[in-house]
Amino acid sequence: MVKNTGVIKFKKSPYIIAEIGINHNGYLGLAKKMILESKKAGADAVKFQKRDASDLVNKLPQLGKSTGYLSKNEKDTNHKSKKFGTWVYPDLRLELTDKDYLELKKYCKKLKIDFIVTPWDEKSVNSLLKIGVNFLKIASIDATNYHFCEYIASKKKATIISTGMSTYKEILKTQSIFKKF
């Protein structure tokens, strides 16, 4: 947990984070509905994921038409077949814009629920800092991505680090990166 930053209010009961991730499917309205339902359910925070696909993947030819349950327009999917289509990553239709994230941050403030976003790349870190997030969160998969951890640590922003599947030695190394800054 973050110490002495006023970012997370410590209390005796657990701090509940509702993981929304990219389950909004690129729809701002659905993201807001998920925030509202999370608040009604008693969550203290909602957490999204932000990525800049151009930073994360090599530019390769598209291998297939993006279809299946992740389809945004629902016209290229036959749900009765119960067959998943091919999902060409990155499916940019699932991403929200920086403007959308700012709107979600304001919506969370209005509902009095904490707004958390896990960035997956340096461009996303910069975008989140620009919109004024209170803190950053590193996904467990990136807890041993020491270059990325150092980049985030250099921003001197309060940070929560998930450490699932990390060894004790790896956690200490990640911790030492943040202590340098």
Where in this protein do the model-derived segments appear?
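A structural motif corresponding to the C-terminal end of an alpha-helix
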Residues: 41, 97-115
